[in-house]
A protein has these predicted regions:
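Conserved PLP-enzyme active-site core in the AAT-like
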Residues: 66-296, 314, 356, 364
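Flexible, glycine/charged-enriched surface loops at secondary-structure junctions
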Residues: 18, 49-50, 79, 252-256, ...
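Glycine-enriched alpha-helix->loop->beta-strand junction motifs that scaffold or abut catalytic
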Residues: 209-211, 331-332, 352
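PLP-dependent enzyme catalytic core of the Aspartate aminotransferase-like
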Residues: 281, 346-409
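Short, conserved charged micro-motifs
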Residues: 236, 317-324, 362-367
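Conserved small-domain helix->loop->beta segment predominantly found in fold-type I
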Residues: 265-266, 276, 280-325, 334-348, ...
Length: 409
């Protein structure tokens, strides 16, 4: 027990001295953390509210009802299921509910940002779906005209857009017209940009024509780790999704998430516009400074990004992982990532992916992004000792330890 206590303490101490730029992570506020730790973490609630397979859930039903109704109201949806315990399981449930083995679907492809669950190696392949890809331009934007032509040709059961890399809003309205002609549904995987959508500064998928939003709840949306499905869909499809969530792909759905998820939505309703706006400003500032310092930042002709993400081409196959490893030694945490031109093999990507949402949560703004870019340059381009830079990174991070854009204690 002592060793485990020590390891956990060391992790906490180290991460408080790091600049975390992982695009798929965030931190909850102290208020939401308090909601997260409760007796609910010990309980089971198979089924949907008021139709359970266990007793003792009178308050759980009220909590889950409240969470789902608030998310439906905020996102303008007529359906919400907060039970998926991850974004991947949300995708499994949504895909299974509206397709059958052998159906064809269109995704972005991993080169252009789709999550592995959209692909043959993940949920789509496991469900027996035939996956083909939408078309992209060289500037990291979707080619709507060619993609619509492919929809008309392939006649997919559904298309899935959004995903792991999403620098710019996607052309939902244009795709909707083609999907309507062939009877295809649109699933928008908002895992990375849910907070930006909630704040009204990215795009509004349901208003623009998506049928279903699948998502996780812990990236730009700073809630507990978990998943969710939202949509404007018919009652039969709603029931199919609910049946896919349970019993097909999960049992209990980690009840202690629910109060914290509600708290995070309330925080976004109060502070989200300022928070999300600063996230994007920070991403653009970091991208510009990296570009000015000599890095090959993608999508420069389009202003680099309109989300929390920045993509950098590190030059050669495998350099993404090499640079990420060097930066980790300097207490700068980010990840290697496939970029356009890498193909589908994730082992030796040329790119790195950067996200600004967590450091923004701790109060960093454009000046701090410029300083982070300089740290990255010193390690990657100037070949300074990562361990030496790590000391300066720790001192820099020491001034940013308080979670912002949240209710005070």
């Amino acid at each position: 027990m002592k060793k485990m206590v020590s390891l956990a303490a060391k992790h906490n101490e180290w991460r408080q001295s790091c600049v975390n730029l992982i695009a798929s992570e965030n931190v909850m506020s102290p208020a939401c953390e308090r909601l997260y730790v409760s007796d609910l973490m010990h309980r089971y609630a198979e089924g949907i509210p008021h139709k359970r397979y266990y007793q003792g859930l009178q308050y759980v039903d009220q909590i889950e009802d409240l969470v789902q109704e608030e998310f439906k109201k905020h996102f303008g949806a007529d359906f919400c299921d907060v039970r998926p315990i991850s974004g991947t399981l949300a995708n499994y449930a949504a895909f299974a509910a509206i397709s059958a083995r052998g159906d064809r679907i269109l995704s972005l492809g991993v080169e252009h940002g789709s999550h592995v669950s959209h692909e043959k190696a993940g949920a789509a392949g496991t469900l027996g779906l035939e996956v083909e890809w939408l078309e992209y331009n060289n500037d990291c934007t979707m080619n709507a005209e060619l993609s619509c032509a492919k929809i008309l040709k392939i006649k997919p059961k559904f298309i899935v857009i959004g995903g792991s890399v999403i620098l710019f809003p996607q052309p939902i309205q244009e795709l909707r017209k083609a999907c309507d002609e062939v009877g295809a549904k649109i699933i928008y995987d908002a895992a990375h940009v849910l907070g930006l959508i909630a704040a009204g500064i990215f795009q509004d998928p349901l208003r623009e024509g998506a049928d279903i939003i699948t998502t996780s709840t812990h990236k730009t949306f700073p809630g507990p780790q978990g998943g969710m499905i939202l949509g404007n869909i018919d009652e039969e499809t709603q029931k199919k999704i609910q049946a896919a969530v349970f019993p097909q792909f999960s049992s209990n759905h980690h009840l202690h998430r629910m109060p914290a998820l509600y708290g995070a939505l309330r925080e976004m309703q109060t502070f989200g516009k300022d928070y999300a706006t600063q996230i994007v400003k920070n991403a653009q500032a970091l991208a510009r400074e990296l570009h000015n310092l000599g890095f090959n930042v993608l999508a420069g002709d389009r202003g680099f990004t309109q989300s929390h993400q920045v993509l950098v081409n590190c030059g050669q196959p495998g350099f993404g992982g090499e640079f990420a490893g060097l930066l980790e030694r300097a207490n700068i945490i980010l990840n290697k990532n496939i970029i356009p031109g890498d193909g589908v093999n994730p082992k030796n990507p040329r790119g790195i992916r950067i996200g600004t949402q967590e450091m923004t949560r701790f109060g960093m703004k454009e000046d701090e992004m410029n300083q982070i870019a300089k740290f990255i340059k010193r390690v990657v381009l100037d070949k300074e000792s990562p361990e030496s830079v790590a000391k300066e990174v720790g001192a820099f991070r020491a001034d940013f330890q308080t979670v912002r854009y949240c209710f005070s204690d």
